[in-house]
Amino acid sequence: MNDYYASINDHSICYYSMGEFVEVGDNYIGKYNGLNGYGFRVDKFEIVDGNSYCQKLNYTGEHGEKLALISITLRNEGSEEGIWLHDLSLIGEDNYVGMNWDLLLLANPGLEGSTGIRLSPGMEYALVIPFDILQRYFGRKTFKNIEEYPFFFVVAGYPEEQRIQLSLFD
């Protein structure tokens, strides 16, 4: 479905691998989130039990039965602006997975309660981005084998969509 949507729109999709640094360039994500000067690298991807992870963080709010945790390094090569993290997305071949903003803040205390971040030029910052995987949005068989489901971390949406292919086995 995501590929169909992309095919009827006039933009290209570029795929990257985990461990590869993706320079966003003049691309955008979200309506106002220009990312020129920023880059992303996915260092680790894991799918964990939601209850166990939330217990470690003493979090009692709503969360997915499972969580997709994307460990990234964010780098600023020369922008004076910041970026909104909540515009980043996790997609599959036919599904979008929502970010858990509460867990984002608990997993990254350095954000100090903000879902945006501004790095000084030349700086890097490591983050864990948590996404809720809710069984009701997947078929029973797909959810049972969610570790085999193809996920992509989208770091830019247009004019060029930039997707990092995620793997549990890297």
Across the structure, where does each feature detected by a protein language model lie?
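Conserved functional micro-motifs across diverse proteins
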Residues: M1-L69, R75-D170
